[in-house]
Amino acid sequence: MSNIVIVGAQWGDEGKGKIADTLAEKADLVVRYQGGNNAGHTLVVNGKKTFLHLIPSGVLHQHTKCVIGHGVVLDPVALDEEITRLQAKGIAISAENLFVSESCTIITSYHKLLDAVRESNTSEKIGTTGKGIGPAYEDKVSRKGIKFKHLFDKDLLRSRLAISLAEKETLFRDLYKVEYPTLEQEFDKLFALGQKLKQYAADTFSIIDQAIAAGKNVVYEGAQGVLLDVDYGTYPFVTSSNTSVAGVYSGATTAGHGLDHVIGITKAYTTRVGEGPFPTELFDDVGKFIQHKGGEIGVTTGRIRRCGWLDLPLLKYSAKCSNLTSIALTKVDVLSDMDTLKVCIGYKYEGKEIYCAYPGIDLYKVEPILVEMEPFSIDETVTKDNMPAALKTYLKTIENHVGIPISSLAYGPSREQILFFEDYFKKG
């Protein structure tokens, strides 16, 4: 039995889905525990791409059960569309392999509208995906939320909708002056979706608990990345959930269950979507080269990702925030055959050098300490035997500065293009 957590160690888009899909081959459960359909995971199998937003990456493995935990905010429209799209591709999804927590907070049309009008009416852009994630979490915390199970009860759904709409109606009508669905329109849509999706509703807490007790392999699949964590991230340019390992306990299981591995998924360089500080961002042709070669366009938003050198002070900070046990380094192939290769090992900040970021640091004011690395060139298949010495040095530099080992290396889009240095499912 192994309990494995996959955490994004940067600003998201690190390749978590690829690693989760690979580990799902040996997993009994793959569990999403936070975020919503603002996540976007790309899986490449036999040259064919599959895009996932809500459904866990274990869905391509017939024996693996997929769980959406109670920490996820659930857009029933998006879930219904994703299930339909995947089934049309011949991917089996049923009540036998998809389990959605009855306690997931629901994203409504009101949340999505509020998300959009706020972003368009503020001078400080956050770069939200517009999926209604933040407003849904607001309702959850202020106890105005609608749970997945509420969609199955007409009277309860109508009363919860009335509570949710009460304040928003004033905002839409008087402050933002936008049209919005009536309570009855929203009720009809949500109740119909509830009847359609009810078959997937489950007590996921007990499913996970029983799987662990039975010695099953459980993989927890995070969304976004630690640097977008609402508490640990680059606030206010963050998401609205705990993207660190803490989200596993609040969104899926209990702290009583130990974790065997917490894997920090990290690109060999750094990217960011939307606004916010980015110390190693590249504005030259090198940045454009990485962007083009890496296909750095958001799956969820379609926005071009900002690109820069690997930032080790931030990676070390992420490792501490989530108690990472190792790093899975992805997209190494993007850096192959470059003329110039650099890595950030520290910052100059307020008259001194620092080598690990921290919550109070102003990343707009840091000067990255960049060191030149020897460029490397890799083949379509990378093994321990044919790995270039320059790449080995690059990996060792990361390990030495962050203080944890690199346990796997992804060097291409397909399942086969991963080199594992450690068996995550082997005890001891």
Swiss-Prot record:
Keyword terms: Cytoplasm, GTP-binding, Ligase, Magnesium, Metal-binding, Nucleotide-binding, Purine biosynthesis
InterPro entries referenced in this protein's UniProt entry, alphabetically: Adenylosuccin_syn_GTP-bd, Adenylosuccin_syn_Lys_AS, Adenylosuccinate_synth_dom1, Adenylosuccinate_synth_dom2, Adenylosuccinate_synth_dom3, Adenylosuccinate_synthetase, P-loop_NTPase
GO terms, molecular function: adenylosuccinate synthase activity; GTP binding; magnesium ion binding
Keyword Ligase in annotation: yes
UniProt pathway annotation: Purine metabolism; AMP biosynthesis via de novo pathway; AMP from IMP: step 1/2
Protein family according to the UniProt entry: Belongs to the adenylosuccinate synthetase family.
Protein's name according to its UniProt entry: Adenylosuccinate synthetase
